[in-house]
């Protein structure tokens, strides 16, 4: 066997095993970075020797050529729907009808009712062959290439005890984390948002371009076996047992599946799942109850479009209609101006809802919503009330347009919206009371001016007692004034005032970071300081010049230009300089002195001779980028005392590791 063929085979088996542990057992056996390293190696080998690539290779999930349309597939046997019950009385009626026919010696296999898209997946000789949507139950759309991209679905079944042909039926879902990330990306681009994870999953599965599906992080859980050939193949005699067989073949099955032996146990299960609903990582709208004994299922049979032996026990409605009575505009800690709808209180999803976010002006325009409209409210993810649609034929003649404010409702500063962003923001910055507490907490934080003892609670009290309105006021505080704070005696107050005085002497990079300019983190602040060297040069720069700085793109450049164009922000800066905040002049550094330019370094553990922030600043002065985590792109890890997981990861990746003594030698 060719060396590449052997390694490709071994890597394919190894990665598929890790996928099984990750998606089926919910028990990852290797770090993500190690999985990525193995996958990268497999891609390299398959590129070199494509003739040796396996059909079940995880690289086959990236998506292929776009389709012109979806073909229709006739199901091997109909995919039926379920009847519903909505309360305990209706469930008891369902249970009575079952026991009247098969007696009381039965149990129920209970599982969450996933709110996704039902699909059929066919395996022939253990190899993934095709997949289709439920459609009308008789025929569905061929979504084989899209389903192939879902990482949790095995391309080859595990073991060798599966039938020659097996049909797996289950639900494709979009986890909450993936849904939120998808909508955040859409919101940032000003694109239409998905209303809920179910719509997102359905829309993702019906993409003609499977590469788009591959990017959507879909999940899958099997809920039943479909057709098995030959029919004589020995299967478990219970529904739960058959799900366990699916699990043993590497097919994901929900960990929430449980067998209940009585009506009381079923109700306990229902109530437990409903209580934990918001903590699950996927949307559910009830629980599915199936008679567990296969013999009973066969005896009970089917009605026209549903089995008699199963039902969906639905949760209370998550969508209701109500009246939009008005809109308030709230200002968040980053200045985001968010419209919040005031609603006629309505009970939905188990709680009374009286407010719902409208997100931004684009969302208001998309919905076409006005004050006075009857709207449909949904508890998205069981947590955040969301307006999903208006009821157009109920709009009154006196409905009023929702007008986005041009001035901040808190500080009267201009509300601005940067091109390419969906969110409007107050330009007041540190001047805006809504942003002030968080801004001053950031200003005093360890990575900014590092005022020892100036914690969040101290900042909140200083502002609540009107002792501080802007960062410059911190440097005017007296010990006697500080004793007005709770649990602050004269000794502690004197110590804190001394720490504030020490913080006056800082660095240009720390000062810039402390200002809290959007998207300007430590590394960007350091790059700005190194490039402009003086405050006057920075203040006089244009957006075009900001883009010339390392790691500064068009969006960050726009944030900088907007911040420095606001008189309020310039006044805050001038006041800080006036009270004595200063830093050493930055000298020109010759290119040959940037010995670490282009390198990425990480610090971990306790440094006993160097201050961590000083070490970081000195590394940056030599051109290095100092990161917070180890990756394959890390050039060197400095391991101090009691170094932990970062050191282990660096050793696994083969990253160069040095101690503090070696770092001192490099910096000296």
From Swiss-Prot:
Which cofactor is essential here?
A: Mg(2+); Mn(2+)
Which molecular-function annotations from GO does this UniProt entry contain?
Answer: DNA binding; DNA ligase (NAD+) activity; metal ion binding
| Pfam family membership, one | DNA_ligase_OB
Q: What class of enzyme is it?
A: ligase
Q: Which SUPFAM superfamilies match?
A: BRCT domain (SSF52113), DNA ligase/mRNA capping enzyme, catalytic domain (SSF56091), Nucleic acid-binding proteins (SSF50249), RuvA domain 2-like (SSF47781)
Q: Which reaction does it catalyse?
A: NAD(+) + (deoxyribonucleotide)n-3'-hydroxyl + 5'-phospho-(deoxyribonucleotide)m = (deoxyribonucleotide)n+m + AMP + beta-nicotinamide D-nucleotide
Can you tell me which residues bind NAD(+)?
32-36, 81-82, 111, 134, 171, 290, 314
Is Metal-binding found in the keyword set?
yes
UniProt keywords (A-Z) are:
DNA damage, DNA repair, DNA replication, Ligase, Magnesium, Manganese, Metal-binding, NAD, Zinc
State the active site: 113 (n6-amp-lysine intermediate)
Task: Report if keyword Manganese is assigned.
Answer: yes
Q: Which InterPro entries does UniProt cross-reference here?
A: BRCT_dom, BRCT_dom_sf, DisA/LigA_HHH, DNA_ligase, DNA_ligase_AS, DNA_ligase_CS, DNAligase_adenylation, DNAligase_N
EC number, as in UniProt: 6.5.1.2
Which cysteines does the record link by disulfide bonds? none
Q: Name one GO cellular component term.
A: cytosol
| Binding annotation for Zn(2+) | 408, 411, 426, 432
Q: Which residues form the BRCT domain?
A: 591-668
Which terms does the UniProt entry file under GO BP?
A: DNA repair; DNA replication
Protein family membership = Belongs to the NAD-dependent DNA ligase family. LigA subfamily.
Classification via HAMAP family: DNA_ligase_A (MF_01588)
Q: What does this protein do?
A: DNA ligase that catalyzes the formation of phosphodiester linkages between 5'-phosphoryl and 3'-hydroxyl groups in double-stranded DNA using NAD as a coenzyme and as the energy source for the reaction. It is essential for DNA replication and repair of damaged DNA.
Protein name, per record: DNA ligase
User: Which organism's genome codes for this protein?
Assistant: Shewanella piezotolerans (strain WP3 / JCM 13877)
Corresponding gene? Answer: ligA
């Amino acid at each position: 066997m060719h060396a590449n063929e052997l390694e490709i085979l071994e890597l394919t088996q190894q990665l598929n095993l890790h996928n099984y542990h990750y998606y089926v057992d919910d028990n990852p056996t290797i770090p993500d970075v190690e999985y990525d390293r193995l996958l990268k190696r497999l891609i390299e080998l398959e590129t070199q020797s494509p003739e040796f690539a396996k059909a079940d290779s995880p690289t086959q999930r990236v998506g292929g050529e776009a389709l012109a349309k979806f073909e229709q597939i006739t199901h091997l046997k109909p995919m039926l729907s379920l009847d519903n019950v909505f309360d305990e009385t209706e469930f008891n009626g369902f249970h009575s009808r079952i026991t009247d026919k098969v007696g009381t010696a039965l149990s129920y296999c209970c599982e969450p009712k996933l709110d996704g898209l039902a699909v059929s997946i066919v395996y022939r000789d253990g190899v993934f062959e095709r997949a289709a949507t439920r459609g009308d139950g008789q025929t569905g759309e061929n979504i084989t290439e899209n389903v192939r991209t879902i990482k949790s679905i095995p391309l080859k079944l595990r073991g060798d005890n599966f039938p020659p042909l097996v049909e797996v039926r289950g639900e494709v879902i979009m986890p909450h984390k993936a849904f939120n990330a998808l909508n955040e990306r859409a919101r940032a681009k000003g694109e239409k948002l998905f209303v809920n994870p179910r719509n997102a999953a359905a829309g993702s599965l019906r993409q003609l371009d499977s590469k788009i599906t591959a990017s959507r992080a879909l999940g899958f859980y099997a809920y039943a076996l479909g057709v098995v050939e030959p029919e004589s193949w020995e299967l478990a005699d219970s529904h739960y047992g058959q799900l366990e067989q699916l699990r043993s073949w590497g097919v994901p099955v929900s960990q929430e599946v449980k067998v209940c032996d009585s009506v009381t146990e079923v109700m306990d299960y229902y109530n437990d799942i409903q209580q934990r609903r918001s903590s699950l990582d996927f949307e559910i709208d009830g629980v599915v109850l199936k008679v567990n004994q296969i013999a009973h299922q066969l005896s009970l049979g089917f009605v026209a479009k549903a089995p008699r032996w199963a039902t969906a026990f639905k949760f209370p409605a998550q969508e209701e209609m109500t009246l939009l009575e008005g809109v308030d505009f709230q200002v968040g800690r980053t200045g985001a101006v968010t419209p919040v709808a005031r609603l006629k209180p309505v009970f939905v999803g188990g709680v009374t809802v009286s407010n719902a976010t409208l997100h931004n002006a684009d969302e208001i325009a998309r919905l076409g919503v006005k004050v006075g409209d009857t709207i449909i409210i949904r508890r998205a993810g069981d947590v955040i009330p969301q307006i999903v649609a208006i009821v157009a034929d109920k709009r009154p003649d006196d409905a009023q347009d929702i007008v986005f404010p041009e001035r901040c409702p808190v500080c009267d500063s201009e509300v601005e919206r940067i091109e390419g962003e969906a969110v409007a923001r107050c330009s007041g910055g540190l001047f805006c009371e809504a942003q002030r507490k968080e801004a001053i907490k950031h200003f005093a934080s360890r990575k900014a001016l590092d005022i020892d003892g100036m914690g969040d609670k101290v900042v909140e009290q200083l502002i609540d007692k009107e002792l501080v309105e802007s960062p410059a006021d911190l440097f005017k505080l007296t010990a006697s004034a500080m004793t007005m704070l709770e649990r602050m005696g004269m000794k502690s107050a004197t110590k804190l005032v001394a720490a504030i005085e020490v913080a006056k002497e800082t660095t240009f990079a720390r000062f810039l970071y402390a200002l809290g300019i959007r998207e300007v983190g430590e590394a960007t602040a350091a790059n700005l300081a190194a490039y402009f060297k003086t405050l006057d040069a920075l203040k006089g720069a244009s957006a075009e010049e900001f883009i010339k700085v390392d790691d500064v793109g068009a969006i960050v450049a726009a944030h900088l230009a907007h911040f420095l164009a606001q008189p309020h922000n310039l006044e805050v800066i001038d006041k800080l300089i006036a009270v004595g905040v200063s830093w050493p002049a930055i000298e020109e550094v010759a290119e040959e002195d940037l010995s670490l330019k282009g390198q990425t370094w990480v610090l971990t553990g306790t440094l006993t001779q160097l201050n961590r922030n000083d070490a970081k600043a000195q590394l940056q002065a030599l051109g290095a980028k100092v990161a917070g985590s180890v990756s394959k792109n890390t050039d060197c890890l400095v391991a101090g005392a009691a170094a932990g997981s970062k050191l282990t990861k660096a050793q696994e990746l083969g990253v160069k590791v040095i101690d503090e003594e070696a770092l001192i030698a490099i910096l000296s």
